[in-house]
Amino acid sequence: MSATKLTRREQRARAQHFIDTLEGTAFPNSKRIYITGTHPGVRVPMREIQLSPTLIGGSKEQPQYEENEAIPVYDTSGPYGDPQIAINVQQGLAKLRQPWIDARGDTEELTVRSSDYTKARLADDGLDELRFSGVLTPKRAKAGRRVTQLHYARQGIITPEMEFIAIRENMGRERIRSEVLRHQHPGMSFGAHLPENITAEFVRDEVAAGRAIIPANINHPESEPMIIGRNFLVKVNANIGNSAVTSSIEEEVEKLVWSTRWGADTVMDLSTGRYIHETREWILRNSPVPIGTVPIYQALEKVNGIAEDLTWEAFRDTLLEQAEQGVDYFTIHAGVLLRYVPMTAKRLTGIVSRGGSIMAKWCLSHHQENFLYQHFREICEICAAYDVSLSLGDGLRPGSIQDANDEAQFAELHTLGELTKIAWEYDVQVMIEGPGHVPMQMIRRNMTEELEHCHEAPFYTLGPLTTDIAPGYDHFTSGIGAAMIGWFGCAMLCYVTPKEHLGLPNKEDVKQGLITYKIAAHAADLAKGHPGAQIRDNAMSKARFEFRWEDQFNLALDPFTARAYHDETLPQESGKVAHFCSMCGPKFCSMKISQEVRDYAATQTIEMGMADMSENFRARGGEIYLRKEEA
C-alpha cells in the first residue's frame, strides 16, 4: 500500500501527466509483431517475448549456445503496445475497422443525433472544456438492413473481423517448432470443441450458432476484433468508471490504457457520477478493446437517482445515445421480473446487483412488469441497427454464498434463456451474465444450467467468489471460482479487485485484479486443453531450470514484480546469472542439484558404455579387425 495518500488534485494532475506523455511501450525484451490476413487491412498485433540462448557446453573461453525461440503471446494493448506508433489521446486512436464497415455498404451517417440527451449535451457550451474534440459522426444501419456480425455469419459471410479473430486466437503458435515447447497435457473440456487450428470459417460458424459473440459496434471503429465464446481462449473484463464522489475523466482514461496494458479483453465503463457522457466519449475514442456499459445507471442519473421515476422513454434515449457513441455491449437487466422479487425475501443479502435492485424497486413501486422485459423487442431493434451486443444481466445473482443457486437466481436465468431466443430473431448477439458468490462445490451447476437453458450462449461471470471472509483479498476468493468456472466453459470472467465491497479501485487495484484474472483464465485454458496454451509455461519452466533469470522475468505475466521480488535479496547483476536464488541458496537449490545429478548420470552412462566396449574387445581376443562372420 502507498505510504502517502494523494489529494484529489494530485491524483488528477498525475493522471493528466500520464495521458499527456503517453507513448507506445513494449514489455521488457518484447517486441510488437503483426500477422497479416487475406482481407485488406487485417494486420493482427501480437507481443513476441525474445529469449536468451541456452548454454549447452564448450569451454569458458568458447562456450556453445543453443537458441531459444521467441514466444508469441496474445496482446490487448492495441497501439499502446507498439513503440513505433505515436499516441495522442486528444485525437484518439486510428479507425482500424472503418474501411471494413464502409465497404459493406449497409450503413449511413446520421445528420442528426437520435438521442435528445446527446443533442442537449452538444448544445451546452459550458461542456466545451470537457468534450472530446474529434467527435465521430455516428452511423446506423440503412433502412431494412442489419449490420451485426451474427447477421453476416448467418448469411455465410466471413467478415474481416472474423479473419482477424482467427489469426489472433491461434496466437502465432504455428511459429513454435520446439517439441519441448509444444508439449501439452490432455485437457478435460467438458464438451467444448477446441480445434488445433482456428479458421475464419470456424469463427463464422460459432458466431452463427450463437455460441460466440464479436462485440463490435459500427461506431467504435477503433476497436480490434475479439471473440467471446467457450470454444476460444477465456477472456477477462475490467470494470472502470467514475462515481459521484471520486475519479475524473483523466483518471478513467488512464485506467482504460492501464487495463489494456495488463490484459483486459474488454472494459466496462460503470460511471455513475457527473459527466458520464463526456467520460464515455473519451474512453471510446481511445479504446482498442470493446467497451460495455450498464445503461440503467445513466438513465437513473437522468431522473435524479429516483428509481420510481424511470421510464421506457428515458431508457430508450440512453440506449440511442450510447449506441451512437460506440458502446459495444449493453448489460440489460430484463430478467428481473415482478414475480421473482418475492423469491429474494428470505435471502441473507437480498438483491445485491445495482441494476437488479433498481429494476426490482421500479417493479414494486409501480406494481408492473419490468419495462426492460416489456420493451425487449424494441431494445433488440436498436441493437441490430448499430451491432450492439446484449449482455443479459443477472440482477438476482447471489451476494453471499448462503444465497447461492437459489430459486430466484435460476428463475431469472431461465428467463434470460427466453430473451436470448428473442434477441437472435433480430440477429442480435447475446451473452449471459452469471454470479456472484458460490462455494466451490456448487459452481459447476451454474455452467450446466446456463448451457441448457440459455442455448449455449456465452457465459460471463463475476468471479464467482468462493468464500465471504476475505474483504481486501476478494481478487483471490473470486479468482479461485473464476478459474473453475472458466474450466467448466465460462467464456469471459469479470475481474474483481482487492477493493471489492470496500471502495472504488485505483490504478494499482486494476492491475492486481487483472493479473489475478489472467492467471485464472490461463489456468482454465490449460485445464480445458486449449491448443498451445502450455507453450508459455514450458518456456518458463525451461528458463527456470536453466537459470535464465532475465527470461523468467520477461515471460512472467508481470515482469516488473517478478524482477523486484528477486532483486530484494539478490540485487546485483551477478544474481541474474547465478545458479540459485535466495530461497535455497547455492548449496540447496533443487534445480542445481537436479542438473548435477543429470550430468553425473550422463557421465556414468558414458563410462559404463566404455567399460562394456572394453570388456567386449577383450572377449573377442583383442583383435582390431574382426572377421566378416564375427562383425
UniProtKB/Swiss-Prot annotation:
<dbReference type="InterPro" id="IPR002817">
    <property type="entry name" value="ThiC/BzaA/B"/>
</dbReference>
<keyword id="KW-0949">S-adenosyl-L-methionine</keyword>
<dbReference type="Pfam" id="PF01964">
    <property type="entry name" value="ThiC_Rad_SAM"/>
</dbReference>
<feature type="binding site">
    <location>
        <position position="297"/>
    </location>
    <ligand>
        <name>substrate</name>
    </ligand>
</feature>
<dbReference type="InterPro" id="IPR038521">
    <property type="entry name" value="ThiC/Bza_core_dom"/>
</dbReference>
<dbReference type="Pfam" id="PF13667">
    <property type="entry name" value="ThiC-associated"/>
</dbReference>
<feature type="binding site">
    <location>
        <position position="433"/>
    </location>
    <ligand>
        <name>substrate</name>
    </ligand>
</feature>
<keyword id="KW-0004">4Fe-4S</keyword>
<dbReference type="GO" id="GO:0008270">
    <property type="term" value="F:zinc ion binding"/>
</dbReference>
<keyword id="KW-0456">Lyase</keyword>
<dbReference type="GO" id="GO:0005829">
    <property type="term" value="C:cytosol"/>
</dbReference>
<feature type="binding site">
    <location>
        <position position="584"/>
    </location>
    <ligand>
        <name>[4Fe-4S] cluster</name>
    </ligand>
</feature>
<feature type="binding site">
    <location>
        <position position="333"/>
    </location>
    <ligand>
        <name>substrate</name>
    </ligand>
</feature>
<keyword id="KW-0411">Iron-sulfur</keyword>
<feature type="binding site">
    <location>
        <position position="437"/>
    </location>
    <ligand>
        <name>Zn(2+)</name>
    </ligand>
</feature>
<keyword id="KW-0862">Zinc</keyword>
<feature type="binding site">
    <location>
        <position position="239"/>
    </location>
    <ligand>
        <name>substrate</name>
    </ligand>
</feature>
<feature type="binding site">
    <location>
        <position position="268"/>
    </location>
    <ligand>
        <name>substrate</name>
    </ligand>
</feature>
<feature type="binding site">
    <location>
        <position position="589"/>
    </location>
    <ligand>
        <name>[4Fe-4S] cluster</name>
    </ligand>
</feature>
<protein>
    <recommendedName>
        <fullName>Phosphomethylpyrimidine synthase</fullName>
        <ecNumber>4.1.99.17</ecNumber>
    </recommendedName>
</protein>
<dbReference type="InterPro" id="IPR025747">
    <property type="entry name" value="ThiC-associated_dom"/>
</dbReference>
<dbReference type="GO" id="GO:0009229">
    <property type="term" value="P:thiamine diphosphate biosynthetic process"/>
</dbReference>
<dbReference type="GO" id="GO:0009228">
    <property type="term" value="P:thiamine biosynthetic process"/>
</dbReference>
<dbReference type="InterPro" id="IPR037509">
    <property type="entry name" value="ThiC"/>
</dbReference>
<feature type="binding site">
    <location>
        <begin position="394"/>
        <end position="397"/>
    </location>
    <ligand>
        <name>substrate</name>
    </ligand>
</feature>
<keyword id="KW-0408">Iron</keyword>
<comment type="function">
    <text>Catalyzes the synthesis of the hydroxymethylpyrimidine phosphate (HMP-P) moiety of thiamine from aminoimidazole ribotide (AIR) in a radical S-adenosyl-L-methionine (SAM)-dependent reaction.</text>
</comment>
<feature type="binding site">
    <location>
        <position position="581"/>
    </location>
    <ligand>
        <name>[4Fe-4S] cluster</name>
    </ligand>
</feature>
<comment type="subunit">
    <text>Homodimer.</text>
</comment>
<feature type="binding site">
    <location>
        <position position="501"/>
    </location>
    <ligand>
        <name>Zn(2+)</name>
    </ligand>
</feature>
<comment type="similarity">
    <text>Belongs to the ThiC family.</text>
</comment>
<keyword id="KW-0784">Thiamine biosynthesis</keyword>
<keyword id="KW-0479">Metal-binding</keyword>
<comment type="pathway">
    <text>Cofactor biosynthesis; thiamine diphosphate biosynthesis.</text>
</comment>
<dbReference type="GO" id="GO:0051539">
    <property type="term" value="F:4 iron, 4 sulfur cluster binding"/>
</dbReference>
<feature type="binding site">
    <location>
        <position position="460"/>
    </location>
    <ligand>
        <name>substrate</name>
    </ligand>
</feature>
<dbReference type="GO" id="GO:0016830">
    <property type="term" value="F:carbon-carbon lyase activity"/>
</dbReference>
<feature type="binding site">
    <location>
        <begin position="353"/>
        <end position="355"/>
    </location>
    <ligand>
        <name>substrate</name>
    </ligand>
</feature>
